[in-house]
Each structure stands twice: as C-alpha cells, then as structure tokens.
Amino acid sequence: MSFNDKAAEAVASGDIGVGWLLSDQCEVFWNVGSWEGANPCEILTEWKKSAMTPITIAGLKFTIIGKTPERLVSTNIGGQGHIVGAKCTNYPGYLVCWCPATVGPNIAYSVIQKLADLVKA
C-alpha cells in the first residue's frame, strides 16, 4: 500500500488529525488537516535542538517524552493530543503529525513511523 493510501487510512481511523511531510529544509511536500497558528517548521526546528524543552505550538505546550534525531514524541498534559514525528528512511525528510489524545503517544509514534517508512524520494 502506498504512503497516500496508508495516510488516508490513518486519518480516517482518527490516528492522525494534522500532518506534514517536510524536507530537511522545511519545505512542505504533503499535508493533511489544518491547525490555525501551527507552523510545522517550528516543530522541526525544536525537534532538531538538543534541549528537551517543551514545544509550544499555537499556544499549546507539549512536553517531550522522547526525542532523538529520528524520533519525536511529545504530549500535552492537558489532554490536547500529541506532536509526533519520524524521520523518513527512504526520503530526506520528516513526517510530523498532531495526533488526538485518544491515541496513546507511543501508538501514535508507531503509526507515524510506519508511514514515514513508506515515503519514497
């Protein structure tokens, strides 16, 4: 199944609410949903920093649960969902998504990582 097919499935199932496929230079090559005031480049920039400081997006603070160069998992302790990211293995970029609180952060990461693995250059 293609990236687009699996991404549509993840959106339809409620695993992803908003998502962006970003190049390493922060060009948006794919997106789904919208989030007023959210800037995916800010998320990517914060992810790449070595500090484990919270990420604030559109006025919501997300606490970092785990962060490596390949993985970002953060959650809003007020129950406003998660910001999750995975570096693509076959494409020089990143998949960054907001996932609802009904999906656990680690399950959300698993979904996003599987999608990121489907992205082809």
Curated annotation (Swiss-Prot):
Claim: Cytoplasm is one of the keywords in the record: yes
Higher taxonomy: Archaea, Promethearchaeati, Candidatus Heimdallarchaeota
Any one Gene Ontology cellular component term annotated for this protein: cytoplasm
Keyword Cytoplasm attached: yes
Sorted UniProt keywords: Actin-binding, Cytoplasm, Cytoskeleton
Localisation: Cytoplasm, Cytoskeleton
Protein name: Heimdall profilin
Alphabetized InterPro entries for the sequence: PFN_sf
Domain of life according to the entry: Archaea
Family, similarity comment: Belongs to the Asgard profilin family.
Function: Binds to actin and affects the structure of the cytoskeleton. At high concentrations inhibits spontaneous rabbit actin nucleation. This strongly suggests this archaea has a profilin-regulated actin system, and actin-type genes can be identified in this organism.
GO MF, one example: actin binding
